[in-house]
Amino acid sequence: MAALIISQFGGPDGELAASQRYLSQRYSMPYKEVVGVLNDIGTEELAHMEMVSAIVHQLTRNLTPEQIKASGFDTYFVDHTVGLWPQAASGMPFTSVCFQSKGDAITDLTENMAADGTTV
């Protein structure tokens, strides 16, 4: 279960990408009201990272070697033991290609709506 949930931490649609998306885009936003909203949302996404991290920690803190292997968590465990590392469930490490910051208000806001599943 933790191997799947960790994708919400550092996967392509995870909280790390979301927080960086909003916090990066705020600097080129021409409207101060929107800058504040992007800052607030980015900060909220950081809080989501903390919650996901707590869930992964609770799921992994007392695993036995047998459980680690049986659950498929062994490939993660080899490199990180039970430390939190941002990656997708596939094992791909977090990369900044997961989010965009183009410097154009319409483009950035459209990307935000698409990333959050909002109807565009």
Where are these regions (language model features)?
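Non-heme di-metal
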Residues: 1-120
